[in-house]
Design a protein with these regions (language model features):
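Conserved "turn/edge" positions that cap or connect secondary-structure elements
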Residues: 1-186
Length: 186
């Protein structure tokens, strides 16, 4: 808490209550991502009570406004359809936030969020748009990292995503279309 310098719990439900454990063990470490401005945190959990209507029984990505406690689920379509697989793919894999928390990127095992299972998605938290950053079938992707503005996301892939490099895995960068202006006053 910036005002008091005290400790603040941010993994509470949208109603301010305790999250249930879902299918995860009580000792599971939740791997959070913090926005560069310190206002937003993203994390994954199988808890089914973080937001109303979470009935998919899968691991989902949630974003919390630290100042207000508002919680939103990022791993749904723009119209609210729940993923049919875990997001991110592995327990302990963390989502990535842009500096201002306007974009969250994550891997997904869901096949109904605009791409096949095993790809990387990005949610524009400003307008709710969900963008498929990769569209491979087979192989594995993960560990997305957002640029400061959210305009680019870099992630690893175990199969070639670019026809110029057949058969090669590696790191790939994708433009998200998110454009922001940044101003600093020193």
């Amino acid at each position: 808490d910036a005002a008091t310098g005290g400790l603040q719990r941010v993994s509470l439900t949208a109603g301010g209550g305790e999250r249930n454990q879902g299918t995860e063990s009580a000792s599971r470490v939740v791997a959070p991502a913090l926005s560069g401005d310190g206002r937003w945190v993203a994390f994954a959990t199988t808890a089914s009570n973080m937001v109303a209507g979470d009935t998919n029984g899968k691991q989902d990505v949630f974003v919390v406004n630290i100042a207000t406690g508002a919680v939103s689920r990022a791993s749904t379509t723009a119209s609210g359809v729940q993923g049919d697989g875990d997001s991110p793919i592995g327990q302990g894999e963390r989502p990535s936030l842009s500096y201002d928390g306007g974009l969250v990127a994550f891997s997904t095992a869901a096949g109904n969020l605009g791409t096949s299972p095993g790809n990387v998605l990005a949610r524009n938290l400003g307008n709710g748009a969900l963008l498929a950053l990769s569209s491979q079938s087979g192989g594995a992707v993960g560990a997305p990292v957002s640029s400061r503005t959210g305009a680019y996301v870099v992630f690893g892939a175990s199969t070639a995503l670019d026809a110029r490099y057949p058969g090669n895995s590696g790191l790939f960068s994708r433009f998200t279309g998110l454009q922001r202006a940044w101003w600093w006053i020193d």
